């Protein structure tokens, strides 16, 4: 039976990416799209690349009849998302793409997002949406908390290494390059073409980036003790993609073997042969992740690279992967999209 889908916040980049992928999903049908500021418009007017798809017009959230919806994707900003989800029917399955339900500790949420959490009852039932590590929990979840795109990239590189005990937990550095679509669609001066093209800049450096909250939570959980990493993201003048270069202390061959073993049976995660490094070009527009490992000239140190598309595996693609599990569908359904190259 075809699953009826609503996308809340469909006028943003992640909402558009959800619509693009679900349009060819054999077991999902989009029956409602919300975009309050663009209510009444056709999706093809907001995103011309979706003109050929027979999508419903954008409406305000309160105009949607959720009684016939099987699952809702919530692609709204943090704080807004929790308020909206709190008003949805409690038997409705929800995949939230915002940061609102990622952090289990209310104090940590307030620390990183600057305001108290207003729906802790929902937070208690949310399952963190890093699919390959929470697969069984997601199969029975009602509410999924989608990961941050940067947080997903860093965890794919580091989490198996903590599990395998092959790195020094006190010396982890994540240097990450992110495409500009990760900053959203809102008009911002630093995202103007003249401000960004031809250059790059770090942002939220010095331990200020919000995705550090996810790293702290998840790495510490796996290690069984506090783990803190250095993390500096950089805004790049390309649209899609994340490339994380991770510096760790450990034997390079053991690190490569740990990643290869952990992801051996994962469809969307490919560990490249030792010495080959990941590239954003090779995964653009897809739900695939490439990981590469190489030794450093300094003995006992390794460099791990991970590439993913921030809008697909870093957000909307992974959201659909999680929704498949929640709806009892094959996990890869609708997601075997070949990367776009060049």
Swiss-Prot record:
GO terms for molecular function: N-acetyl-gamma-glutamyl-phosphate reductase activity; NAD binding; NADP+ binding. The keyword DNA damage does not apply. It is found in: Cytoplasm. Pathway: Amino-acid biosynthesis; L-arginine biosynthesis; N(2)-acetyl-L-ornithine from L-glutamate: step 3/4. GO terms for cellular component: cytoplasm. The active site is at residue 149. Belongs to the NAGSA dehydrogenase family. Type 1 subfamily. This is N-acetyl-gamma-glutamyl-phosphate reductase. It comes from Rhodobacter capsulatus (strain ATCC BAA-309 / NBRC 16581 / SB1003). The gene is argC.
